[in-house]
Amino acid sequence: QTVEYVPASINGPHGCANYGLCTDVTTTLVSSTNISVIYEYGCDPDNCYCLEGTTNGTEPCDTIEDQCGNNPCGDPKYFLCTSKIKSYSCSCKPGFTGNDCKSELGSACATSPCRSGATCESVDNSTAGYKCICKWNQMGENCEYDNFCANPQCQNNGNCSMVVDNANWICSCPPGWQGRRCETPDTVTTPPVWDGCYKYNFQSIGATTTKFSDNQLTVDKCNKYALQQSSDTVTMNYLTLCGGFCMVSEGPLCNDTSNWDDDCKKKCGGNNNEFCGVLNKRCIVYEAGTAEVDENACDNSTFCSADLGQGLCINWQSDFTDGYACICKPLWTGRNCENPVPEACTPSPCLNGTCVLNDQYNKFTCVCDDGFFGDKCQYSDICTSATCLYGGTCTELNNGDYKCDCLLQYFGKNCEVINRCDYGKPCNNGKCASTIDGITTNYTCTCDDGWTGTNCDTMIDFCIPNPCSYNSTCKPKFKGYDCTCITGLTGVNCSTIIDLCVPYKDSTGKWIKTPCNSKDDMANCTKGINTLTCSCGDKWTDTLCDLNILIKDVLMAIYGYVDLTMISLLNDLMQNPSQIKDMVPFITGLLTDSERSDLSWDAGDLFNWIAFEDQRLDLNRDIHKWNDVVLGNCFTFNHRDRNFTYRLRSSGRHGGIQAFMKTRQDEYAPWYDTAAINVFIHNRDDYVFSESVRYNAQPNAQSTMNIFMTRYTRLGGRYGKCVKKPSEVKNYYYPGAYTTDGCLRTCYQDRMKQECNCMDPRYPQAPGNVTSCQLSERSCVTVASEAAGDPSKWWDCVCPLPCSNQEYSVTWSKANFVNLPIICGKSSDVSTCKAHYIDQLMVSIVLPQLDFKIYAENPAMDFNKFLSQLGGQLGVLMGINLVTFIEVVFLLFGLFTLCCKKYGK
Amino acid sequence: MRGGGFVQIFKDFSNWSTVAVVPHVANANNKISRIFWIAIFLFVLGMFAYELYILIAKFFSYPATVNTEILFEKQIFPVVTVCNMNPYKYSVVKSNSAFSSVNTLMTTYSDATVGTFSTDKWGLYADNDETYDLDSRAADALVLEANLISDTAKVPALYTYADLIQDCSFAGIPCSESDFTKFIDPVYGACYSFNEDASLNYSVSREGIQFGLKLMLTVTQTKTNGNTDSLPTTKLAGARIGVNSRGSSPGLDSNGIDAGVGYESAVSVSLTQNVRAKKPYGTCVDREPDSSDYYKDFIYTLETCFNGCKQRDTIAKCQCANPRLALGSTDTACQPIKADLDCLQTLKGNQTSSTPNIDLLVECNCNPPCDESTYTPTVSLAQFPSTSYYVATSSTAGVGSCSSTNSKFSSKSDCQKWYNNNGMIIQVFLETLSYELYTETAGYTVSNVINDLGGQAGLWLGLSVISVVEMTGLMLVMGAFCVTGGAIKMAPDDDEIENDHRIKDVEDVKKEIDHLEKKHGEMESGSDGEVDDIENKGDEEKKKK
């Protein structure tokens, strides 16, 4: 049973156009019989690999790239260019012929009489006449001769000319020169001969002889000078060299040789190998060289058969080739051109063609008949259309063989071999070994390191499994991998944890043991991946043990969380803890009244009971609760907002207030250093500020406060300036009656509003949308307050005294509770009861006497008193009364009348 | 003729009267001028009348002026009264049969404070919800119970001088029990007053703490054996101090100073004297009427007046007297029963009620005293004893010094601790020898009235004493004229004037002047001049006569 493969397409070898190759040849069973099995092979269009010079068009590889874009054939007017795969073919356009296709059909140049390279031009449009325009190195009527004189050949102004039937060239030398290119002088010189060293005598040598001087004197230069000075009658035969002087003479100039050995060996300035002697002492004497004209050997006409016309004689140097050389005609040879040479075409060497003779060189060229090739047309034609396969070009060789110029990717004598590894790059990263398996070629890939897969197109992934520790990112690369460590890890495989618990130098240059120990020396640091764990001491907390526990407690109490922006501020606060009480209002001032009130005490928190005139009061009805930013919740008896007004009806303790209260120190904020109940005693219309006069009532004691009232009334109008209502001043932000303190604080708040764009939260705010200063703005408030100074001295702050106000002065005394109260004596736990009891206190407000002082401004003199005193003074001193003024008026009137009369006259 | 005579008299008077405008009215040339001057006269007379009214009204309003003087002189040292805040020794109350009722009260109150109530005669069970009401009722009940016990029977439970005062010195000189006057206060028990007796003459010639009274007191809230000796109703450990002038009521219940144990209480006092004016310039009184004066033994003060008024109100409403206040000779003290205690409770402040009880300021008609001395105290504290002080005392009746020989304490520190819990030092001194004297005097006296009246009269009418004499003279002349029937001549008759040679001479001159004026054509002006001259000369002649 035979297996036969049949191509599915006329395109070879795999079905792609223009000899395209297939990267994956498919075979299909067409028929199968007992005798044979026939497969049809083809190529999927997507797998066609186009040869260089072809591209995909309508079908794969069906378009041949244009190779005639730059007119490779020549002038487009005469040539017709056809593109081929990576080449082109040239032909003459219709109507033209000749080698350069410039000759029109029917003209004299149509037969191409001129040599290749020359230009043929018709003469007068005749069919017979033509003119050949030769190239620069051509000559002859049809430019059939090479012009050897086109390139410069002659030297020393020699003249080149073609001779011996234009088969050779010759230089006509000017006088004094000889040789084929006139390169050889026509004289023969002998060198100077050293004669001896003699003593120098200026009187006999230097004074009269012919001489010249040269610092670079050599013997040759002196010899040339002697030749120049020689004439037909006088011959300079001796050279005398004394230092840099050359003296020439017919006879020797000196012959004194005494003591010459020590002074003669002075080297010449121009040639260290020669001796010139020393001036004034010794001179070297040479015998001058001679110059003879070389004989012209061509004078003998028998040389080179010149007389016979078989060659030409060239004069040459006498010691070389006997003084002449021969240039023979093409048909002659030999030393003297005496031997004849037959013509190249006689007999004809062309076996199957016509012999063409080249006269210039006596060479032949065979023009073979059809069907024959070779130098002598001895070989029959071998190239046919089937000789070279797959687009290869067949060229017949001179030895009778042929050569196929295959397209790319095709190999073999007949271009029948396809190397699969040469196209398509089947092995991307490896070595390809081609194998032949039927009509389809196959390959085996030996992959390089780092690659895998059938075609070695898959890079080995070294990241499977992941070699990087702690789930770091592995990035594969050629022959390896790169681990991109997560923060806190290092090493090739990220297997090393960077230890953050290392000493470092802080901004002040101080070494810190670990980051955990910047504040807390007792902290322990444990390293982790991109982190560290600090075990803090008992005074510090937070991640790095740099947050004071007190600060954290404060922040948790204020904000409910640790506000990082406030930590630095609070750290500064720890250096000066007394500031914290001043800073708290800047935080609580941001809250609403209801929120602040909820943070502070209720009446039930502070009061066990309160009594007035020995009668217990109702906390909800008689005690008014209000909130201040600094003081918190305050409780006022007889507040102005209450409907009922209690009056003081009797003096003494039984006519005053008594209260039994609690300080609740267990619920104090940690920044309060003292425990007491602040007692403010004021007129009911006055507003209480956090800076108003207060009295402290101490725990575990009864504090008795005796109050004394003083009332002030002032005169307004022209007697002075006083204020009756808050509306009389520019701004007044506080409820109740006008007070100087309130007015000054109003000025202060206006200044804070102007400077810091917010108001101090420690005082009540102005109505409207004015915001309270926050903790971050506290420094602005502090600086502005210090810069502004006392509000009472500001030019825009006018705060007169009120027209009427009351002041209370207080004296106090104190007595402690008994050591064992009866309620604790009965208690089961005495110590706990006592600890609870000493946190309480009693306050007693007493008016010892009912009388009080009134300081009232009265006018020192009223109108009536003024009249009385005026009348008294006038009456006593001058007896003047009111009628006196009228009498004076009458007197003046009379005088006026009298003067008028006199003037009238 | 009579009418003519009066007119003549008035004319003569008006010519020489010093009252303003009157001569002008009499000598007016025409009717318009006369009306003008009459109008002026009426105007100034009206103004004078108005000003006179103002002066009289001001005088009868009796304004007062307070003069302030700052005096610097030697002063009599004030009376200093000290009492223990615990009125009775609890150990004696528990053991003495005379105090059995008080002991029962204390026991019932102690149980009530821890929530155990029982039916008792004082009604403590009624205040089981309120601590204050319970404490208040118990304190009142204690006063009432103690009032039933005679002073003699109280002596064992009271603190003696030796119990209370361990050391006493005045200006560095030791003082003794004889310098103190003892009295029994209904609230504080035994109290001792220094310099109260008139026979004592303690005075201060230099100010400062070195020249005052220094007392070391022990209140013994805890005995040396560790037992508590304070009554259950006593809440404070210390002494009650009163500073007042001699003869005044101490008023400890109302106005005393609290001095606590464990401290030295330095009490500096400054004196203020008030001298007030009586009616009509002021309202001060020297004493109340005898019928309503409950504090006859003391100098009158507003406080004594108010206390008496309150006592009368209590008697009127409760039919019994409050022992805290002074009792009259015919008054009966309230009994320590629930009914009386409830009645006393209703008399306390209830201003919010629709029927409030007595307002002393409005209903008592109390007036300030005409002479009053007030001491204003200022208290400062120091720790007592210091840790290294061994508490030296010369008294042998008390606990004694903290020396090694004291057998009452096991160690010196125990002794110091006892003194810290039970002892104190009181220093009372004059802050300065200068004191303020406020004297209320009449602000507008008769002298002021006369001054102002003279000025106003002089300005408007030109009136003076001379004018008054003139008026008097006019009245006498008119009277004489009426009596004699017009026989007296005040001026010569017209005929006599014509015969007088001086008048003739004047007439001759007049003729000549008229003649000259005719020549110059200035007849009218010349006549006017002559008339004036004649009138002037006539006046001179009249005056000469």
Curated annotation (Swiss-Prot), chain B:
Reactions catalysed: Na(+)(in) = Na(+)(out)
Keyword Glycoprotein: yes
An annotated Gene Ontology molecular function: pH-gated sodium channel activity
Residues exposed to the Extracellular side: 56-457
Keyword Transmembrane attributed: yes
Pfam families: ASC
Disulfide-bond pairs as recorded: C83-C191, C284-C370, C305-C366, C309-C364, C318-C343, C320-C334
Glycan-bearing residues: N201, N350
Residue window of motif GAS motif: 462-464
Transmembrane segments: 35-55, 458-478
Recorded topology in the membrane: Multi-pass membrane protein
Location in or out of the cell: Cell membrane
Gene3D superfamilies per the UniProt record, alphabetical: Acid-sensing ion channels like domains, YojJ-like
Segments in the Cytoplasmic topological domain: 1-34, 479-545
Assigned protein family: Belongs to the amiloride-sensitive sodium channel (TC 1.A.6) family.
Subunit structure as annotated in this protein's UniProt entry: Can form homotrimers. Heterotrimer; forms functional heterotrimers producing channel with different properties.
UniProt function note: Could form pH-gated heterotrimeric sodium channels that act as postsynaptic excitatory sensors in the nervous system, generating rapid, transient inward currents that fully desensitize upon extracellular acidification.
Protein name per the record: Degenerin-like protein asic-2
Annotated organism of origin: Caenorhabditis elegans
